[in-house]
Design a protein with these regions (language model features):
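An N-terminally biased module of ancient metal coordination in phosphate/nucleic-acid-related enzymes
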Residues: 1, 16-25
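Hydrophobic faces of well-ordered beta-strands that scaffold small-molecule active sites
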Residues: 1-3, 26-28, 53-58, 91-93, ...
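Active-site acidic/histidine proton-transfer and metal-coordination neighborhood
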Residues: 12, 48-49, 65-153, 240, ...
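Acidic (Asp/Glu)-rich catalytic clusters
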Residues: 15-20, 35-55, 74-87, 108-118, ...
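Conserved radical SAM core fold
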Residues: 59-64, 188-192, 196, 235
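Active-site clefts of carbohydrate-active enzymes
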Residues: 189, 199-201, 223-237
Length: 261
């Protein structure tokens, strides 16, 4: 479970809920909360709740502008260092924004260099085109879809695929052996359908072929990580939030062919 599932709750509460819901591990989204950047504190939480930290999500620019400074390359390097320090093997990163000129022009080289020096997999995440007044805006560079990029590891997010009008199953098939990581969620439609929000629905509540994708990966003995990244901010209580998280766990275990707890 990604700690972003219960944002803005404190990090320890995220670990508690992940444990109560029945998840096997945690992805830590680096935010303004100091605990998300403190390897010692994170290891203590991992030990306390018996949940390994599987991955680190590098800071997202729009939410964490000044976390670890303003240089996006430094942010990615620090994320890899944090991953190594807490025993995670993967860092999830979004493609650069076009206005991050030096970073975007050298992004794939930077990713490969950090992977080589740190031993951490950098899973570049699929995003979606931005639109303004019905027109596409080139917000990302090299782009929003890493399908054909020269990188060794990618992350598949179903909500992003939905907003982009793509099929998560087709993306998984196209990514092939480069698919390292999955953000388990769903979406109900694309921007062309009038959808404007990145929904991160409970899997099975949208229109993406999430079940089919998990079953496809299970059939080929895929060994990456499936990490829940659903939006529970509308939950009126922890009980309601926990219900959504447990539903997500059951969905994943069912379609991956794993025994439910």
């Amino acid at each position: 479970m990604s700690t972003s599932c219960v944002y803005p709750l404190e990090t320890e509460r995220a670990f508690q809920l992940a444990r109560e819901a029945g998840f096997d591990g945690v992805e830590v989204m680096v935010t303004n909360a100091a605990t998300t950047r403190d390897a010692v504190a994170l290891r203590k939480l991992s030990k306390k709740y018996h949940l390994p930290i599987l991955s680190i999500h590098a800071p997202v620019l729009l939410l964490t502008t000044f976390v670890w400074g303003r240089d996006p390359q430094v942010k990615l390097e620090r994320s890899a260092e944090l991953a190594a320090a807490v025993g995670a093997d993967t860092v999830v990163v979004h493609p650069p924004f076009r206005w991050q000129k030096d970073y975007s022009e050298n992004f794939l080289e930077i990713v490969r260099r950090i992977e080589t020096t740190s031993g951490i997999n950098i899973g570049v995440e699929n995003m979606f085109p931005w639109k303004a007044k019905g027109r596409s805006v080139a917000a990302y560079a090299p782009g929003w879809d890493p399908s054909d990029w020269d990188c060794d590891n990618v992350t598949l997010d179903f909500s992003h695929a939905s907003l982009a009008g793509q099929s998560g199953l087709e993306l998984a098939q196209h990514f092939g052996d480069r698919l390292r990581h999955i953000h388990l969620c769903d979406g109900s439609g694309s921007q062309d359908d009038g959808q404007i929000f990145d929904e991160h629905l409970i899997p099975g509540m949208g229109t993406q072929p999430v079940a089919e994708t998990l079953e496809y990966l299970a059939a080929k003995n895929w060994d990456g990580a499936v990490v829940a990244e659903i939006n529970t901010r509308r939950a009126k209580s922890d009980a309601e939030r926990l219900k959504a998280l447990r539903k997500t766990v059951r969905f994943a275990r069912t379609h991956l062919g794993l025994h439910t707890r």
